[in-house]
Amino acid sequence: MAPKKKVTGLIKLQIQAGAANPAPPIGPALGQHGVNIMEFCKAYNAATESQRGNVVPVEITVYEDRSFTFVTKTPPAAELIKKAAGVAKGSATPHTAKVGTLTQAQCEEIAQTKMEDLNANDVQAAAKIIAGTARSMGITVEG
């Protein structure tokens, strides 16, 4: 087995799927670790092509020899909730001004999507996490 490469950096970014380019914030974040920026952009765009229109978080591990690996995550819960509720952004005062509604079924659907990234044992627990996020954004959860 090949010897382990030494990790020199871990970069977390949230980038539009299929739309990574060397402009800020991607260029400076990768440049300071000496990563080939265009190589990352091409690999990321190819990996997220099917999810266009979503924001996809990515965790980039940079090694001593300036090579890298990356892992894409599921879109942020807040983004999925906004899309399902049909609102542009959450409420500035979530406990007084409500901006939209979600059904329990929509919560479970989002929970199903986010399941691999959530710290929950089953879909019901994951749906409660999603419902809590929605409430803190000023979106009412029915059911």
UniProtKB/Swiss-Prot annotation:
The record's account of how the chain is modified after translation: One or more lysine residues are methylated.
Top-level taxonomic group: Bacteria
Keywords: Methylation, Ribonucleoprotein, Ribosomal protein, RNA-binding, rRNA-binding
Alphabetical GO biological process terms: translation
Pfam family, one: Ribosomal_L11_N
InterPro entries the UniProt entry points to: Ribosomal_uL11 (IPR000911), Ribosomal_uL11_bac-typ (IPR006519), Ribosomal_uL11_C (IPR020783), Ribosomal_uL11_C_sf (IPR036769), Ribosomal_uL11_CS (IPR020785), Ribosomal_uL11_N (IPR020784), Ribosomal_uL11_N_sf (IPR036796)
Single GO term (MF): structural constituent of ribosome
SMART domains named among the record's database cross-references: RL11
UniProt GO cellular component terms: cytosolic large ribosomal subunit
Family to which this protein belongs: Belongs to the universal ribosomal protein uL11 family.
Record function comment: Forms part of the ribosomal stalk which helps the ribosome interact with GTP-bound translation factors.
Subunit structure: Part of the ribosomal stalk of the 50S ribosomal subunit. Interacts with L10 and the large rRNA to form the base of the stalk. L10 forms an elongated spine to which L12 dimers bind in a sequential fashion forming a multimeric L10(L12)X complex.
Protein name: Large ribosomal subunit protein uL11
Gene this chain is encoded by: rplK
